[in-house]
A protein has these predicted regions:
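Active-site-adjacent substructure of cysteine-protease-like catalytic cores
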Residues: 28-49, 86-137, 143
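Noncatalytic regulatory segments and standalone regulatory/sensor domains
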Residues: 135-173
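Short, intrinsically disordered/low-complexity patches at protein termini
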Residues: 57-58, 130, 164-166
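Cysteine-nucleophile protease catalytic domains, especially the papain-like/related folds used
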Residues: 1-88
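Short secondary-structure transition/capping segments
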Residues: 81-88, 128-131, 153-161
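Hydrophobic transmembrane alpha-helix bundles
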Residues: 69-82, 120-125, 143-151
Length: 173
């Protein structure tokens, strides 16, 4: 089966979370907000430091908080829901149903495993938007922050990105 949302405007961004939210807000609400406004309304400025001596890299420093997207939706009064599903099959069924219903859906995963990304570094809180899939070809179509067109990613890479099993994971946010 193949399903893709064709009428989604992708505007490249400097940051994955604020860029994804800006594109989703435009799609669902018709609000054409600047990425900086999205970041500010989401109270995005924060500092988070993770120290994982056995990981690669051994530490991460973030300039934004973990709840920026939810905070933005709350500030704007927009219906927003995040869910965690550690089972890959159940997670795929949930987002598959969203796409079949014509609803682009933001996902979170480790950027390292997304096979269309050339820069390979572990970042398990990368935000991107699922726009469609082709199960016969084993691929999905993703709006990411770099390009103004959908990226093609294997379904296997998407599953590994969302729940790598052996490293820090966002557990299929």
């Amino acid at each position: 089966m193949r399903s893709i949302i064709e009428n989604f405007r992708i505007v490249p961004a400097g940051h994955c979370g604020s860029g994804a939210m800006r594109n989703l807000i435009y799609h669902y609400c018709g609000l054409d907000l600047d990425e900086g406004v999205v970041f500010g309304l989401g109270a995005g400025l924060d500092t988070v430091y993770f120290d994982f001596p056995d990981a690669q890299p051994a530490f991460m420093l973030f300039g934004r908080g973990a709840t920026m997207e939810a905070d933005l939706a709350d500030t704007l009064g927009i219906d927003y829901h995040e869910s965690v599903q550690p089972d890959n099959d159940l997670a795929w069924q949930a987002v598959r149903e969203e796409i079949l219903a014509g609803r682009p859906t933001m996902l979170s995963g480790d950027i390292y495993y997304l096979d269309y990304r050339e820069f390979k570094v572990h970042f398990p809180a990368h935000r991107f938007i699922l726009l469609g899939f082709d199960e016969d070809r084993g691929e999905c179509y993703i709006a990411d922050r770099v390009n103004d067109y959908p990226e093609t990613c294997s379904l296997a890479a998407l599953a590994k990105s969302r729940n790598p099993g052996s490293s820090l994971s966002t557990l299929n946010l």
